[in-house]
Amino acid sequence: MSERVILAYSGGLDTSVAISWIGKETGSEVVAVAIDLGQGGEDMEVVRQRALDCGAVEAVVVDARDEFAEQYCLPAIKSNALYMDRYPLVSALSRPLIVKHLVDAAREHGGGVVAHGCTGKGNDQVRFEVGFASLAPDLKVLAPVRDYAWTREKAIAFAEENAIPINVTKRSPFSIDQNVWGRAVETGFLEHLWNAPTKDVYDYTEDPTLNWSSPDEVIIGFDKGVPVSIDGKPVTVLQAIEQLNARAGAQGVGRLDVVEDRLVGIKSREIYEAPGAMVLITAHTELEHVTLERELGRFKRTTDQKWGELVYDGLWFSPLKTALESFVANTQEHVTGEIRLVLHGGHIAVNGRRSQESLYDFNLATYDEGDTFDQSAAKGFVHVHGLSSSLSARRDLAGK
């Protein structure tokens, strides 16, 4: 029996060409694995059949939408994950899930090699291969696009020469990756930083001015950090993301034009659309402001940033990320309540908060009659709080 290669299959040009190329160049059989992450577009059965038509001996489609939402997007919500304070890890979150299912497929179908279609410039090669090394160090890795310097032109030529059944065009200007958490667009004229995105860049979001006269007010309920309701109606995490993608997307919310620091050392420009993700992270962050004690909240903001950096850098399976998630789980014990937001003109505005776990005390906060704050204690507090600063200032002045 020939050696089997388990290929992460997207249904696009590069991975369709890879099926035929691997067979011709290595003599191996290819098992194509396509993961449904809520990316929409083509029917997954069409994708599966294409893999078979391209020469795969088997083609597997995994419906991982709920798994992706519950086990990958939800931790990102709880960690308010925004790489460089902006990017909600649209692609980065999906890669470890794909790795997991490729490893499972390798065990089930007798594969000794796993393959991906990443280039040598991007972050995804790291995310895939560090993931494989973490979960299945015995598996060999094949990366034909990177290791054999494929270009789009070369891939198209190979497809035409070998009658690979896929429709391609040399004029498609963008590289696109999408799932239910969001959509990433790069390359083409966007590589020139001064060029503004054109309308055809966007798909998940409408023009922010389109529904200008119809703002959308939404109430999101959380239970211990988990989104559980929208406008009082129970939802799963996947349903919350999908519903907010539609509602926030209609208001032009979630458009991000970012120059980010890639793991490989270069800067790249990316256009992201993540309407549901940005609304959920905004709401969750606001509820934490209401329910977390000050020092806990301050420290968690540092761990949120680190968690996002670890995921971006392909270290999903690292001990540090695992440890941080244990900490985050503890912080979510009281993150229960509702946040009201207005979605309008591409913006998210919080205008209401309520929680039985709130640390906001009206009687302490009010400046009106009924104030219970003991202002007589403030003078001594200010003196003690500033004592170290006043002592050092006194010393410095005496030395002049």
Swiss-Prot record:
Binding site for L-aspartate: 119, 123-124
GO biological process, one term: argininosuccinate metabolic process
Entry binding sites for L-citrulline: 87, 123, 127, 175, 260, 272
GO molecular function: argininosuccinate synthase activity; ATP binding
EC number: 6.3.4.5
Keyword terms, alphabetized: Amino-acid biosynthesis, Arginine biosynthesis, ATP-binding, Cytoplasm, Ligase, Nucleotide-binding
Record's subcellular location: Cytoplasm
Binding, ATP: 8-16, 117
Keyword set includes Ligase: yes
Pathway(s) the chain acts in: Amino-acid biosynthesis; L-arginine biosynthesis; L-arginine from L-ornithine and carbamoyl phosphate: step 2/3
UniProt superkingdom: Bacteria
The family this protein is said to belong to: Belongs to the argininosuccinate synthase family. Type 1 subfamily.
HAMAP family for the chain: Arg_succ_synth_type1
Matches recorded under NCBIfam families: argG, PRK00509.1
Subunit structure: Homotetramer.
Entry protein name: Argininosuccinate synthase
Gene: argG
